[in-house]
Amino acid sequence: MRFPSIFTAVLFAASSALAAPVNTTTEDETAQIPAEAVIGYLDLEGDFDVAVLPFSNSTNNGLLFINTTIASIAAKEEGVSLDKREAEAWHWLQLKPGQPMYKREAEAEAWHWLQLKPGQPMYKREADAEAWHWLQLKPGQPMYKREADAEAWHWLQLKPGQPMY
């Protein structure tokens, strides 16, 4: 489950719980919330490494979910210098011949990435193309479809000197 969906579920559950009427006359520990008002529920009982913290700054406020295991490791490494983590680009970067040094744009222009073979058209083919556009005939091939019961003279071939009977 992704963090935004968890965050949204807890935020809606918290807002529903805060909007519920508070009964001060009885000593009930639980708030009476109608089932229709509940948008979602997030159970964190079995997760011991998840902490929910209130968060607010000048632009945002809400609940912050953190992994306590990662937070404790990061707190221990606070004084460690990052000198050994720096790497020089020429050491690990390898470019193939002709590969650009820059990152490609998401919406690249056609001339930038399109490569045409000799004789290939610049346009997209139509779904119902005309016959002259895609039909290719070999020398001596007829333009028509052969009949199923073709006449003998049409398909019979005689060698020189061969009798007709």
From Swiss-Prot:
Propeptide boundaries: 20-89, 105-110, 126-131, 147-152
GO biological process, one term: mating
UniProt cross-references to InterPro entries, sorted A to Z: Mating_factor_alpha_C, Mating_factor_alpha_N
Highest taxon, organism lineage: Eukaryota
Role this protein plays: The active factor is excreted into the culture medium by haploid cells of the alpha mating type and acts on cells of the opposite mating type (type A). It mediates the conjugation process between the two types by inhibiting the initiation of DNA synthesis in type a cells and synchronizing them with type alpha.
Domain statement: The mating factor alpha-1 precursor is identical in S.italicus, S.uvarum and S.cerevisiae, except for the number of tandem repeat units: 5, 3 and 4 respectively.
Name of protein: Mating factor alpha-1
Organism: Saccharomyces cerevisiae (strain ATCC 204508 / S288c)
